[in-house]
Amino acid sequence: AVGVKTKRRIAARLVKGAYWDSEIKHTQEQGLSDYPLFTRKAATDVSYLACARDMLRAKNIYPAFATHNALTVATILEWAGDSRDFEFQRLHGMGEGLYETLVREQGYHTRIYAPVGGHRDLLAYLVRRLLENGANSSFVHQLADEKLTDADILADPVRKIAAVGGTRHPGITLPADLFAPERRNSEGIDLNDRPELERVAEAVARPLDLRPKDGPAADPLVTRALKGFDTWSKRSVEARAACLDRLADLLERDRD
């Protein structure tokens, strides 16, 4: 839309998987309702290809496809036909054989991304790359697995997803069930989600009680709390914990 409005062609880089682990972990820690990404790699691959197809069709976008996946590259080349008005991108030290073929033998535009900086700046980046490409499901890792055949490595991701009915990965539970069956995870709010943010803003704008409370109004409440402390302290840890759990549930329920 921006390209059409400004009558300019905008370079757009398509990537996948770089922050998958951290996004999963963040969503679990925050106790959000669901994950903002796919839990199966095949679904991510299908989504990447769908985006790539739309980018190839867009006249106001210069597509840059960042991938080390040979099947993804082959699919994009098939869709592109004779067009070469796009480029492929790889990380320094990875996908060299695949990109050597693209550049030397076929003459496609490619770009190599290399990290630059001190040890402190680069360590987090390198760890993310190790996690991404060291995963069992990554294309680079599968290439080194002698137990996998070419057919296994180049299996159609669409068929993979169809075979499981599009269901989520069974080993990645919803954030709410992270600690099941012992307890339910606390519920968080995704402030990056506009409907959620608007709901919070609306709740803040209309508090349940607009009447301010002064010190004298709190005195009877403190007195009641002190009277009940002796009885409360004699209750078992389990009973008190159950009360706190119930209070937390009520706070979540009536948060708005």
Label the model's feature ranges.
Residues 1-185:
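Positively charged, amphipathic and often flexible ligand-engagement surfaces
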Residues 141-256:
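Short, structured beta/alpha segment
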